[in-house]
Amino acid sequence: MNSRSLIRLLSMALALGALSGCASLSKSECLNANWEDIGVRDGANGQPEEYLIQHSTACAKVNVAPDRGAWLHGRDKGLERYCLPHRMYNIGEYGGAFDAGICRNFDQERLVDAYEKGRDVNRRANTLSEIDAELRDIRTKLENKELEKKERERLAYRLGQLEYERIDAERSLEHARRRARDL
């Protein structure tokens, strides 16, 4: 790496470090770094190539520069563990974001399909949770002995509607989970 590239990399690292607020590696990790192993870990966690800038910032404090080649080699190995359909499904199911660029050397169609199935499960589970919250709220209101008759009737009617909606939402969620089993 020439000095101009190193200066540019360090400048970006300092800017990113100032924004990020916390070090990606400790002083000890920098001083004893096996950059390939760190790359494997980062790849397995789906970190983008730009993440190396954070390591550069953290390690600059102890005058250590990352071995970019070793880190990239390790990251590629780690991505083999990250860029899998079941991982993308889990990211989608738990509401995470999918960055297709990170897994650009893998089967994008399968990964996006898995992610979308996970997102579908996430959306349906959220719908079910919202219905459950509204059901609890209505049941709590119906416990009020001073509730006016018209309001009690309105709430009781809505409670019945929600119970049917909940059955549909449960079926919908189970259907989405069954669709995802073939990953």
Where do the protein language model's features map onto the residues?
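Sec-dependent bacterial lipoprotein signal peptides
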Residues: 1-22
